[in-house]
From Swiss-Prot:
It is found in: Cytoplasm. The lineage of its organism: Bacteria, Pseudomonadati, Pseudomonadota, Alphaproteobacteria, Rickettsiales. The active site is at residues 277, 351. This is Cytosol aminopeptidase. InterPro entries: Leucine_aapep/pepB, Macro_dom-like, Peptidase_M17_C, Peptidase_M17_leu_NH2_pept, Peptidase_M17_N. Mn(2+) 1 binds at residues 270, 347, 349. It comes from Rickettsia prowazekii (strain Madrid E).
Length: 500
């Protein structure tokens, strides 16, 4: 794991040294001294604008010309227009620096920032750089018996000197706790589905959350049936692995504080059931439980920081499989709410799981607000791609705060519409509700959201985050390698701490 240390004096042993330069390409007094020490290597680099122009995110790794010095490379980083820097952009710079250092095989890196950079103090700026680098250091190699040369190398340490190291370390320690929660979310999402059965997943939740003081209740199929959760059980009835409902109660606030409920879709693997998915890319359905992972990760982040709030998380863990006992298209199930649902398509299963879980959390905990997170529809990916997740809500203020929280951590949300016309599309001829709309291919993410909305009680603020397009990525980003992103943990943590 990457070690990040805030030190009181510059080390003479670091192989790489980070240098920040904005689009003005002007060197301050500290950089002038460093430039002279390295025979004007920095100024010569920035004079060649084809090599380095100071644009945001531009990074040039330049070999040092001093043979007797431990510093083998200068990592010259463009800040662009410093007036436009945000916390999210600075974090991304940290991730990009780590990636470039990894490619150049620079094992140890030094960074010295003792002045403000625009509105950011040196502790704030450096803690964000450190956070981005730490997030980008994540790897999932546990099932590889041999690693390629490019996979073997990892940056060992970053040493940072600021004008207030204790403050910088304090800021970074909080960000590190959040990043470790993101790592759990990525880990459990990347885990193969034959390993993370509902039982194993539930055990891992208990293992990580109980030591943090979170009350955990793992409910098996017998008790789920007694609760009347016919929709959730119907999804999992084709699997040999028993479905689970996991309830996580974090009581960080006072008894008088209201409870916020987080609900996550935990479809461990989704074949589509009898409405079979195409075989191409079906292996990616290991990520169909990413909504539940985001909920668990958020609880980890809150509990590890001892945030003074009351939050309950509920995740329904099921497998949507084929067998002689699998749910059939046309089946009717009775949900916990008493409403009946016609299952017109067994591949629209996530909303069935959520219908029972959101009802359960309202019945048991009487929350003021419910936020559900799910890789719910391919339609949201068609609409928004992998840039935004969809946000549906019955409360404008709630939606606005979630969107602001997402902007702050670069986990972006786009507000999607709710409308009576969409609600009418999910009326069933033989039951109270159908699990898909009656117009093929039309408004799929909107009708799915309305299905969940039918199970939200009057007076409860509700938001539905459809993360199907952002939960995993086929390409590495500044903060994450290819695979599970861990989307939602930082967004929800930010929302709960600062906007709730």
């Amino acid at each position: 794991m990457l070690n990040i240390n805030f030190v009181n004096e510059e080390s003479s042993t670091n192989q790489g040294l980070i240098v920040f330069i904005d689009e003005q390409l002007k060197l301050n007094n500290n950089l002038i001294a460093l430039d002279q020490q390295h025979y004007e290597l920095i100024s010569k680099t920035i004079q060649n604008k084809l090599q380095f122009s100071g644009n945001y995110g531009q990074i040039t790794v330049v070999p040092s010309v001093i043979k007797s010095c431990a510093v083998k490379y200068l990592i010259i980083v463009g800040l662009g227009n410093v007036e436009k820097l945000t916390e999210a952009k600075i974090e991304e710079l940290g991730g990009k620096i780590l990636q470039h250092a990894t490619c150049a095989k620079i094992a140890t890196i030094g960074l010295k920032i003792i002045n403000r950079i625009n509105r950011f103090t040196s502790p704030t700026f450096t803690s964000l750089i450190a956070s981005g680098a730490f997030l980008a250091s994540y790897r999932f190699h546990k099932y590889k018996t041999t690693l390629k040369e490019v996979e073997k190398f990892a940056v060992e340490s970053i040493e940072i000197l600021t004008d207030n190291n204790s403050e910088a370390m304090k800021l970074f320690e909080v960000k590190k706790l959040i990043a470790e929660a993101v790592f759990f979310t990525r880990d459990i999402s990347n885990e193969p589905s034959n390993i993370k059965t509902p039982q194993v997943y539930a055990e891992r939740i208990v293992e990580i959350l109980e030591p943090l003081g979170v009350n955990i209740d793992v409910i098996g199929e017998h008790d789920i049936k007694n609760l009347g959760m016919g929709a959730l059980l119907g999804v999992g009835q084709g699997s040999q692995n028993e479905s689970k409902l996991v309830v996580m109660e974090y009581k960080g606030g006072s008894r008088d504080d209201s409870t916020l409920a987080l609900v996550g879709k935990g479809v461990i693997f989704d074949t589509g059931g009898i409405s079979l998915k195409p075989s191409s890319n079906m292996h990616l359905m290991r990520y169909d439980m990413a909504g539940s992972a985001a909920v668990v990760g958020t609880i980890i982040a809150l509990a590890s920081q001892k945030v003074p709030v009351n939050v309950v998380g509920v995740v329904g863990l099921v497998e949507n499989m084929q067998s002689g006992n699998a749910q059939r298209p046309g089946d009717v199930v009775v949900t916990m709410s008493g409403q009946t649902a016609e299952v017109l398509n067994t591949d629209a299963e996530g909303r069935l799981v959520l219908a029972d879980t959101v009802w359960y959390v309202q019945e048991k905990f009487n929350p003021k607000c419910v936020i559900d997170v799910a890789t719910l529809t391919g339609a949201i990916t068609v609409a928004l791609g992998s840039t935004y997740a969809g946000c549906f809500s019955n409360n404008d203020e709630l939606a606005d705060k979630l969107i602001k929280a997402g902007e702050a951590v670069n986990e972006k949300l786009w507000r999607m519409p709710l409308h009576d016309d969409y609600d009418a599309m999910i009326n069933s001829d033989i039951a109270d509700i159908a699990n898909i709309g009656n117009v093929p291919g039309a408004a799929g993410s909107c009708t799915a959201a309305h299905f969940i909305k039918r199970f939200i009680k009057d007076g409860v603020d509700w938001a539905h985050l459809d993360i199907a397009g952002v939960a995993n990525s086929n390409n590495a980003s500044a903060l994450c390698p290819k695979g599970a992103v861990g989307y939602g943990v930082r967004l929800l943590e930010k929302f709960i701490k600062e906007y709730n």
